[in-house]
Amino acid sequence: SAEFDGRKAGGPLTLVCACNGRYYGGGFNPVPDARPDDGEIDFLVVRGMSRLDFLRFARRYSVGRAHELPGETCIRHRGRELTVEAREPVCVSVDGEELRSRSIVFRAVPGGVNFIFPRGMEFFKDSNMKTGEK
C-alpha cells in the first residue's frame, strides 16, 4: 500500500513514483510539472496493471501522460510525504541506486538542498518571466 499525506492507495500497486523534478533515467518524464524548488514531492501511483498492460502504458508514462488512464488506475498527488509498505521486499530505485525493502518513506525537506542554475534556464523560464529576468 502507499500513503501520501494521510491518503491511502490500496490494492495491487504496479508503480509508485516520487518525483522532485521532471526527468529521470535518461528522459522519463512521468510528472511534467514537478519542480525541485516548491517544497513538495509529486507522487504518481499506478494500480492494478498487468505486465502486458504496463508495457503498453510505458510510452504514455515516459512522456508525462500517465494521468490520462481511466478511473483510479493512476493517482497523482503533490505533497510532503509518501510511505510505501509491502508484505515482501520490493525493488526500490532511488536516484539510480537500487535497494530492496518492505517499507520506505519519501519526505520533502523544504530548503534542504540548494541548487545553482544558469540564468534563463528553460526549467525556470516561467518563473524568470514573472520576475523580469531573462
Spans of features found by a protein language model:
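Long C-terminal subdomains/extensions of small-metabolite kinases
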Residues: 1-134
